């Protein structure tokens, strides 16, 4: 059975905040001082919510910026989950190097 793709930060922004509050993407963009394209690309999942954007979103929605940053980080980790084995295949744990007494040049 195919799994649905994970919900993106942009979907949360649109479906949980903008639509219920009756706020357009353009109005939000003007209010937070970014281009409408930036907000639209976040909504479409084509752009990430950066730490700077998290600060703007937090101020706009009267929330902590960490909330928006956390949503983005969680999404980023979910996207990398399928590549985890490939990314870590050749990495030796630090404890293994320490136990073997190997040192690297500074």
Q: How should these model regions be labeled?
A:
Residues 1-23, 70:
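A short, Lys/Arg-rich alpha-helix, primarily the initiator
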Residues 33, 44, 73:
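Residue-level detection of the helix-turn-helix DNA-binding "recognition helix"
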Residues 17-18, 62, 73, 82:
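A generic structural signal for secondary-structure junctions
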Residues 67-106:
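Short, charged recognition helix plus adjacent turn
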Residues 18, 29, 58:
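The alpha-helix within a helix-turn-helix
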Residues 46-59:
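Short, basic-rich loop-to-helix N-cap that marks the start of a DNA-contacting helix
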Residues 23-41:
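Short alpha-helical DNA-recognition segment
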């Amino acid at each position: 059975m195919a799994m649905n793709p994970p919900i993106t930060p942009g979907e949360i922004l649109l479906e949980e905040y903008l639509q219920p509050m009756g706020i357009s993407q353009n109005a939000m963009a003007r209010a937070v001082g970014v281009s409408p394209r930036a907000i639209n690309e976040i909504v479409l999942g084509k752009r990430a919510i950066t730490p700077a954007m998290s600060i703007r979103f937090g101020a706009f929605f009267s929330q902590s910026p960490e909330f928006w940053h956390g949503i983005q980080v969680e999404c980023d980790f979910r996207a990398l989950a399928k590549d985890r084995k490939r990314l870590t295949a050749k990495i030796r744990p630090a404890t293994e190097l320490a136990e073997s007494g190997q040192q690297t040049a500074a």
